[in-house]
Amino acid sequence: MTSHLKKVELHCHLEGAAPPALTAAQARKYGVDISAELRDGAYVWHDFASFLVCYDKVSEVYRTEEDYALLTETYLDELAGIDTIYSELIVSPDHGKRIGLGADAYISGICEGIRRAREKSGIEARLIVTGERHFGPESVIGAAEYAARAANPLITGFNLAGEERMGRVADYARAFDIARDAGLGLTIHAGEVCGAFSVADALDAVRPSRIGHGVRAIEDLDLVTRLADLGTVLEICPGSNIALGVFPDFASHPLRRLKDAGVRVTISSDDPPFFHTSLKREYELAAGTFGFGDAEIDAMTRTAIEAAFVDDETRKALLARI
């Protein structure tokens, strides 16, 4: 249905993209029992709490620089196989520290995976360093400082993820100031678990060019108009939203309504195998379920490239491929 279309992804958590087959091999390598979390080639969870447990258990089997190179390469190879030309991966140097690998080795492994994948298929990728709300403002500021001083050409953006209900967006504004001053692109998770107010708070406190999810802005039509007027880009992940119960079904999902209202929207997969989806499926949903034609889908893909955290030369080259 969309196999002939070029694809771009702006919102995907690296550990959340771990292919089940690779995770199973990694678990065997380290002698880790993941039978409760991985059955018949699929990740198993039944509510948000068990999703987090499953996610953490899967992350446990990626431990070394080479493990992260392999994970990154494998996912980007999968994307390249469906004609994806660009991917932004959400990564957490804090996670690298927590598992004892270290932030630098964690990032180095991921960058090596990007290099290997690009060498094979030409796929471009960049990294968005994320702070995690549930670890508090100081931790998030530390993540921003790491991204700012890394001087790594593949680190081009900064994000805030984690539990949306932990603190006000304003509590984390300093981290975004640090990232902005370093020339990093800004995006933030909002309007997913929490309502439209969290999107408004993000616009007020952070002034991001993009918002991760943002779909619950639909609950406030004045806010929808504001998003359209500002040109703020939403990184929308329909499969994730349904899997987590943000909306009960695709018929009630606001992707089409947001786009028709003039909001700049893009398509991503979030944590694809955990939500039994993929970027390929998300594009197919756009066509088959939401009724977008090829030209409309290409327009969303161009929007993603226009909003990507890349230099102008790379952006121009990517746009030429659509």
Curated annotation (Swiss-Prot):
Cited CDD domains: ADA (cd01320)
UniProt similarity note: Belongs to the metallo-dependent hydrolases superfamily. Adenosine and AMP deaminases family. Adenine deaminase type 2 subfamily.
Residues engaged in binding Zn(2+): H11, H13, H189, D270
Family annotation (PANTHER family): ADENINE DEAMINASE
Protein name (record): Adenine deaminase
HAMAP family: Adenine_deaminase (MF_01962)
Keyword Transferase listed: no
Domain of life, per lineage: Bacteria
Cofactor requirements of the protein: Zn(2+)
Site (Important for catalytic activity): H213
Enzyme Commission numbers on file: 3.5.4.2
Organism the protein comes from: Rhizobium johnstonii (strain DSM 114642 / LMG 32736 / 3841) (Rhizobium leguminosarum bv. viciae)
Binding-site positions, substrate: D271
Top-rank EC class of the record's enzyme: hydrolase
Cofactor binding notes: Binds 1 zinc ion per subunit.
Catalytic activity: adenine + H2O + H(+) = hypoxanthine + NH4(+)
Keywords tagged on the record: Hydrolase, Metal-binding, Nucleotide metabolism, Zinc
InterPro entries tied to this protein: A_deaminase_dom, ADE, Ado/ade_deaminase, Metal_Hydrolase
Function per UniProt: Catalyzes the hydrolytic deamination of adenine to hypoxanthine. Plays an important role in the purine salvage pathway and in nitrogen catabolism.
Molecular function as annotated in GO: adenine deaminase activity; zinc ion binding
